[in-house]
């Protein structure tokens, strides 16, 4: 029996797992002991990776839709030719930007790189992905405040922090291994700020049940009180930051009296939270989608960063303003996908970076794309406006997951060509495609992923591919070959080739990985970037900003702030309730296309969409447990749910898990001004007993 160490490709923790394989079958999966991320632990999703493509497995050959709606299977060679010819015809007829793509946060670094090079540099297409839906806010905030999208922490900080503050995060459900690190810490206070009395809130020492989307007001008020009470770290502010005086003047108007009224907390609760921050010696702030997915999300993230900076809680053990990433390689997509910045970072109009990246890739600088991609929402809007004619969807299911998802259904119907590349042919998106390209799951892949704390780890094939089965990397390569892209066919033959290109592109950047050898990642503890050529690995867990130096031109972090914006979707008499969304259970993943293959997960979860409603509101509406209800959204759509009664949501709020397509039928087409990340958490709705 062989033992193969590889990386889980669900969430951004990137647990390592030992796969025990015999006769090309996975006999058991055991979490890797002493791996610095998960140290012998895993959630149910990771230890069930052997279930991928066991109940639902497509024919391994590509297929095309014929005129009568039926499908015809092709050889891979003919499939690549079909994709290349149809993309070329559309580009020639309508122009380069008539073609676009939407990808994921779950491919490898090497696949992101190859796809980004082919689609962006060679074809000049717009390519965005799931990272826009979950982490764009954090990426933009980091870049503006720190000078680069560089989360500074290591997971060890959860075990070293004496005051752990979760804001819009529910790690017990969404990141259970991260929560395990919290439990390892014997000397901590846990604070949760969340409108919902979530699983994490229930296991916290303090819960602040803030009103939905009033985070920014609360955060500015906390800053004002900290300044008034002289609780700031003046030395750190002076030596390592800029624009604090402007911030100090700005927050004066955010008084505790106003915040109490707006946020739904008592003045005493707000003042208590200030004292908890002040009394902590090592305070860490942790946020995820509850902050990232909002109409003023970037400024909310930066308000958290401001609190860490002004109290000196950054760059030290157990501290930091720490974003919790969602998908397994969202961090890799942020720096190595060629979508919002050059490979390895840097703006597309930066002449020095353009020259270095072109040299690293061995191409003429003129081949490099010269602007960022259109964001996800603009791609959908341009399809519906008739400007984008072809869309290539890779490893994602936007018919379900896109906000206000009926707009994506409309878009699919308007396309001349929809290509879907996925491990399943029966997702809501796959079923609508013109060309389907089947890919193998992660247990048959090779490459690299980067986790939420910047750790590169190896994805290594645990099972041999069967006849006609291909990795995403091989599919991209085959299409590039059919397109006649000699630069790719000659130089990007293997994932290792792509990794070495990205390594060269990273030289001199904050994410420098020139000291990482592809082969050395296998059977290792992973390596956090930066790791430059000549560096020696002294410890498995390293943090950034320990020297107080940031990646801005003057090496100082910036205090950034902006007046709290008016909510674009206020409640009204017609739509009096707020519709909040999030993960339902530990075992479910996104649109359930993968986790539906785990029997004990599916046995435990609802087969129908459900939502939580406050018991008092339910009583007033005549709604009882398991009643069927209709929820009507201001976006014009309605959906049916099963009602679950609870005291864990406020009277005027509803909560629905994202794993059912009905949920995002109701979410709004509202986006943060800077990150263009959708505001998934704050639709306004009304609710009725079915049949009323």
What is each stretch, according to the model?
Residues 466, 472-527, 595-611, 616-692:
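Long, contiguous, secondary-structure-rich segments that constitute the structural scaffold
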Residues 27, 233-234, 270, 284-285, ...:
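Acidic/polar loop patches that form or flank catalytic/metal-binding clefts of enzymes
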Residues 278-379, 453, 537-539, 548-551:
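A glycine-rich, hydrophobic/aromatic-adjacent loop/helix-cap motif
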Residues 174-190, 305-306, 404-418, 455-458:
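A short, gly/pro- and small-residue-rich
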Residues 69, 229-267, 344-359, 363-368, ...:
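N-terminal leader/propeptide and maturation segments of large enzyme subunits in energy/redox metabolism
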Residues 196-199, 423-460:
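Flexible glycine/proline-rich, aromatic-decorated loop/lid segments
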Residues 333-339, 497-601:
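Long, low-complexity segments enriched in small/aliphatic residues
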Residues 1-229, 247, 253, 266-267, ...:
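N-terminal export/assembly segments and adjacent metallocofactor-ligating motifs
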């Amino acid at each position: 029996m062989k033992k193969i160490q590889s990386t889980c490709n669900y969430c951004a923790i990137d647990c390592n797992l030992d796969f025990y394989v015999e006769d090309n079958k996975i006999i058991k999966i055991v979490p890797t002991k002493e791996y610095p991320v998960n140290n012998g632990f895993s959630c149910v999703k990771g230890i069930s990776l052997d279930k991928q493509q066991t109940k639902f497995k497509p024919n391994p050959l590509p297929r095309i839709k014929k005129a009568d709606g039926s499908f015809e299977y092709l050889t891979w060679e003919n499939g690549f030719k079909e994709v290349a010819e149809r993309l070329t015809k559309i580009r020639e007829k309508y122009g380069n930007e008539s073609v676009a793509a939407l990808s994921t946060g779950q491919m490898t670094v090497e696949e992101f790189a190859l796809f980004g090079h082919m689609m962006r540099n060679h074809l000049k297409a717009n390519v965005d992905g799931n990272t826009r839906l979950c982490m764009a806010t954090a990426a933009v905030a980091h870049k503006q405040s720190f000078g680069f999208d560089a989360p500074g922490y290591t997971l060890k900080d959860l075990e070293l922090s004496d005051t752990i503050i979760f804001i819009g995060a529910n790690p017990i459900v969404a990141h259970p291994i991260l929560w395990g690190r919290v439990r390892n810490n014997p000397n901590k206070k846990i604070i949760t700020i969340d409108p919902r009395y979530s699983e994490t809130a229930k296991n916290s020492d303090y819960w602040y049940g803030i009103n939905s989307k009033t985070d920014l007001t609360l955060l500015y008020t906390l800053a004002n009180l900290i300044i008034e009470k002289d609780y700031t770290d003046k030395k750190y502010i002076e030596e390592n930051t800029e624009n604090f005086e402007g911030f100090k003047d700005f927050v004066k108007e955010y008084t505790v009296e106003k915040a109490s009224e707006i946020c739904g907390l008592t003045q005493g609760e707000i003042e208590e939270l200030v004292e908890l921050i002040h009394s902590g010696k090592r305070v860490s702030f942790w946020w995820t989608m509850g902050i990232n997915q909002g109409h003023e999300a970037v400024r909310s993230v930066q308000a958290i960063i401001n609190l860490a900076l002004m109290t000196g809680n950054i760059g030290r053990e157990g501290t930091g303003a720490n974003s919790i990433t969602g998908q397994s390689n969202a961090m890799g997509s942020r720096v190595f996908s060629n979508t919002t910045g050059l490979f390895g970072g840097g703006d597309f109009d930066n002449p020095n970076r353009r020259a270095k990246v072109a040299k690293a890739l061995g191409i003429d600088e003129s081949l490099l794309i010269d602007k960022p991609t259109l964001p996800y929402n603009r791609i959908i809007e341009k399809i519906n406006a008739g400007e984008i004619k072809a869309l290539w969807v890779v490893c994602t299911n936007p018919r379900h997951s896109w906000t206000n998802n009926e707009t994506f259904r409309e878009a699919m119907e308007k396309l001349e060509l929809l290509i879907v590349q996925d491990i399943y042919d029966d997702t809501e998106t796959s079923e609508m495609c013109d060309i389907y390209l089947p890919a193998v799951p992660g247990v048959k892949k090779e490459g690299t992923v980067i986790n939420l704390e910047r750790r590169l780890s190896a994805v290594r094939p645990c099972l041999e591919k069967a006849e006609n089965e291909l990795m995403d990397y091989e599919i991209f390569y085959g299409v590039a070959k059919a397109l006649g892209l000699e630069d790719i066919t000659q130089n990007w033959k293997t994932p290792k080739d792509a990794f070495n290109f990205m390594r060269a592109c990273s030289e001199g950047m904050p994410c420098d990985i020139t000291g990482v050898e592809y082969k050395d990642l296998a059977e290792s503890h992973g390596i956090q970037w930066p790791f430059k050529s000549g560096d020696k690995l002294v410890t498995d867990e390293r943090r950034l900003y320990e020297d107080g130096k940031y990646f801005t031109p003057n090496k100082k972090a910036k205090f950034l702030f902006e007046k709290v914006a008016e909510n674009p979707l206020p409640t009204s008499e017609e739509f009096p309730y707020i519709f909040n969304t999030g993960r339902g259970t530990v075992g479910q993943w996104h649109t359930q296309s993968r986790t539906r293959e785990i029997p004990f997960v599916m046995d435990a979860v609802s087969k129908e969409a459900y939502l939580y409603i406050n018991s008092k509101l339910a009583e007033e509406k005549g709604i009882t447990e398991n009643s069927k209800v209709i929820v009507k959204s201001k976006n014009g759509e309605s959906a049916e749910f099963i009602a679950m009664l609870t005291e864990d949501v406020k009277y005027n709020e509803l909560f629905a898990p994202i794993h059912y397509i009905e949920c995002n039928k109701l979410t709004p087409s509202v986006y943060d001004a800077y990150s263009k990340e959708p505001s998934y958490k704050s639709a306004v709705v009304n609710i009725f007993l079915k049949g009323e």
